[in-house]
Amino acid sequence: MSKRVYIETTVVSYFTARPSRDLMIAGHQEATRELWPKLTAKYETYVSALVYQEAGRGNPDQAEMRLGAIKPFRMLDIDDEARTLAEKIIAGRGIPEEFPEDALHIAVAVVNGIEVIITWNFAHLNNPFTRMMVRQIVENEGYWCPEICSPEELLEAGE
C-alpha cells in the first residue's frame, strides 16, 4: 500500500522556481525535481485547499505554474476539525501564532491520516523543536502525528 504524503507549499515553489545560483537553494530545487515524479508513481500525494490558495498568490505566470504542478494531486478540504486542531497547535506553542497557516498545514494532514508532511519550511515546520512540540500536542489530542521531512530526507529514505 502506498504511503500517504502531503506536499506543503514551499515544495511546490522550489519545484517551479527558476534555477537559483545560491548553492543551497539550487540543491533544494534539485532534490525537489528528483522527488516530483515519485510523488505520483510511489505515493498517494495530497495537497490542501490552503496549498492551492498559497500557490495561487504572487506573479500570475509563476502562480499558474505552481497550480499546474499540483493539479495531479488529491486535494484535502479544510474542515472545522482541522481548524480546531490548528488552534490547539498554536495555543500549545507548537507553531508561532504569527504563522497560523503552518499550523493549518499540519492539522489538515493530521485529521486526514497523512503519514508524511513534506516541506522546505525549516523555520516553523521541519526542525527538531517544532516537531517535538507538535507531536506532543497532536498526540495529546488523540491523533497520530505524521512525520515531517524535507524532499531530500524522503529521497534518502528510498521508500
Predicted feature residues:
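Short, well-structured N-terminal submotif of metal-dependent ribonuclease cores
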Residues: 1-47, 54-67, 73, 91-97, ...
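A structural signal for short, well-ordered beta-strand segments and their strand-loop junctions
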Residues: 6-7, 46-48, 117-119, 150
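A general structural signal for short secondary-structure junctions and capping/turn motifs
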Residues: 36-38, 107-108, 138-140
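Residues at the C-termini of beta-strands that transition into short coil/loop
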Residues: 49, 79, 152
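Acidic, metal-coordinating catalytic cores used for nucleic-acid/nucleotide bond scission
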Residues: 53-57, 123-126
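Active-site neighborhoods of divalent-metal-dependent phosphate/nucleic-acid chemistry enzymes
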Residues: 73-133, 155
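C-terminal end-helix/capping segment
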Residues: 125-147
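Electropositive, surface-exposed helix/loop patches at the edges of structured domains
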Residues: 149-159
